[in-house]
Amino acid sequence: MKPVIKWSRGKTWAIEYIKKLITSEMLEHGTYIEPFCGSASLALALQPKRMILGDLNSELINIYKIIKEAPDDLIGSLVWMRLSHEESTDYFYNVRAWDRDHKFESMNPVSRASRFIYLNKTCFNGLYRVNSKGYFNTPLGRSSSGNPIDIVQSDKIRELSAYFNDPRNSVNFVCAS
């Protein structure tokens, strides 16, 4: 499986090396714990039966919870965001500014998850960066190929949700902030 988001300083480069060190028995019977999951590229490549994905970033952990609990709501929200993005580049900066609103913390978790994915897909190099006040501040990026950016990724979201919800698997999320 492929990640839904890009993550700077991720473990994608080390996947093949790490896969050689982990036995199938470990993946079948052990609990895989990833304390700094980021895009979860390593966990998704390994696909353990039991895993705990953790991170300090509560918005990041929220997207995984929403992918598990409400994938269709997330996809619907992302479709709406894609259409709004195509109409105006100002839309990016409006969405980016949501975290400056004092109501952001109480915002619907699906809206926050779709915001995170939208910004990740449309900002410069998918770089998650916040300023000293904790506000997301990466500027708008451009597709280097000139092709439209796949903001929605419904196939990836559904595949990941199916894996998270498979009764043979135990997948939990922890935010350590």
PLM region descriptions:
Residues 28-85:
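Conserved S-adenosyl-L-methionine
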Residues 2-22, 26-27, 71-177:
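SAM-dependent nucleic-acid methyltransferase catalytic core
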